[in-house]
Amino acid sequence: MLSKEGDFSKEQRERLSHFVTNLDSPIFALKNLPEVVKGALFSKYSRSILGLRALLLKEFLDGEGGDFLSEDLQDCELGIQKAADFYRRVLDNFGDDSVGELGGAHLAIEQVSMLAAKVLEDARIGGSPLEKSSRYVYFDQKVNGEYLYYRDPILMTSAFKDTFLDTCDFLFNTYSELIPQVRAYFEKIYPKDPEVSQSAYTVSLRAKVLDCLRGLLPAATLTNLGFFGNGRFWQNLLHRLQDNNLVEVRNIGEQALTELMKIIPSFVSRAEPHHHHHQAMVDYHLGLREQLKSFAQRYGEEREPSLEKGVKLVYGDPDGLYKIAAASMFPYSEHTYADLLDICRKIPDEDLMLILESSASSRENRRHKSPRGLECAEFAFDITADFGAYRDLQRHRILTQERQLLTTKLGYSIPQQLLDTPMEAPFREAMEKADQAYRLIAAEFPEEAQYVVPLAYNIRWLFHINTRGLQWLCELRSQPQGHESYRQIAIDMAKEVIQFHPAYKSFLKFVDYSETDLGRLKQESRRKA
């Protein structure tokens, strides 16, 4: 392996120094290389006896692939194209999907609806999304006299155009008008402590006000997202975007493909409309959706849908504690998992509890992760809560979440702080107006009707998660600085699991059950200190 001092000539070392972080250590990083060149380099790496630096020299710096180093723009693009051609051959001819994870791209996706943002964030593995916050950013701005929300072309050319526009404008007007009223009210009931800085108090108060009013924003509200994803992530996401039922989502898919083809073409070319892989994927998705939809309608029509709200544990693994104990001991044993399970079932309960407690007792804070053995016990929940809370919790990825259409049929949530205040009536009026508009539009356009539904309305989703993931989620999302809506969901999930079996309490010991006023005040005070 060419990596030791003296293996490279002085000239080679000079050339390599521009592209690797060191020339001698067996651990180094790449730099100053196009994504497609890095991807092609790593693809060849897995089939070569050479070290990566030697391979970089042979294939790209000294070979024909070195054209990308040229100061001449055309030669540079030619070199990148050669790397891209190789990469495409690997992907198409050998089917090595994993090489699609060897490069990636940052993509800004701006001025898309909050509804579409959820479709984008459905993609779980290989990508990292970041979205404009409804907690720190006011959504009351206008551009050219219009509030910033998505105007779906189907609705805008339908008989419901005026209903849609009037309702969204009414929701935004109510949101804008209530901001100063709620701020003044909170200043009165949550006065500033003399020991707290004005800046920390202001930030916390603003978060509280916007948390309280975000439920008025319709799902059509425009937001911005930033994504980093590897090539495989982008390819899979582009397939799904381009076969979505919503025009907006399909347009996002087309535009995203156009931009990604400019920087990582080899990674996403199989998502181009004319590519046989893409068309086969679209046909598969469409056929599967139609089949499952028909089954859901056929077998669900005789039962009235539940209107129950909140968190309900649907399934808890009856052997979960045995599985956790056995899997936690497995790396340190010579027995099979099956034998360890049998042992755990037969030992006295107090001994089983000792094993379980050992996986939890040494944790000093929520960032101390428990053993992976906790991943062997799983839970499933039905959750019916406001769409705003779903938007926050949906970003957790090491689990399974499936949502139903956003409607007004499951009612809405109103912040406790607004009850019995002058702000309650306008909030409820806005909800009722949105409900009327939704029901009119949904009769003809059930998917497009989602755009007019405010974030305060409830949505139902399935939440399937293992104990380790549940531990992370509940302990994180129950912290006082969180939004009260998802805080309550996290707390209720923890309570449901502990009620299922008290032994799980030791795994959830950093869940915060406290009631808070200005939840972010402590965190902001630390930030300003």
Swiss-Prot record:
Q: Which family does it belong to?
A: Belongs to the UPF0159 family.
Give the UniProt keywords, A-Z. Repeat
Where the record annotates domain ThyX, the positions are 38-274, 309-511
Per its UniProt record, what Pfam families does this chain match? Thy1
Q: Which domain of life is it from?
A: Bacteria
Q: Name one GO biological process term.
A: dTMP biosynthetic process
InterPro entries membership: Thymidylate_synthase_ThyX, Thymidylate_synthase_ThyX_sf
Q: Which PANTHER family match?
A: FLAVIN-DEPENDENT THYMIDYLATE SYNTHASE (PTHR34934:SF1)
Is Transcription among this UniProt entry's keywords? no
Q: Which residues form a coiled coil?
A: none
Which protein is depicted?
Answer: UPF0159 protein TC_0921
This entry's Gene Ontology molecular function terms read:
flavin adenine dinucleotide binding; NADPH binding; thymidylate synthase (FAD) activity; thymidylate synthase activity
Source species of the chain: Chlamydia muridarum (strain MoPn / Nigg)
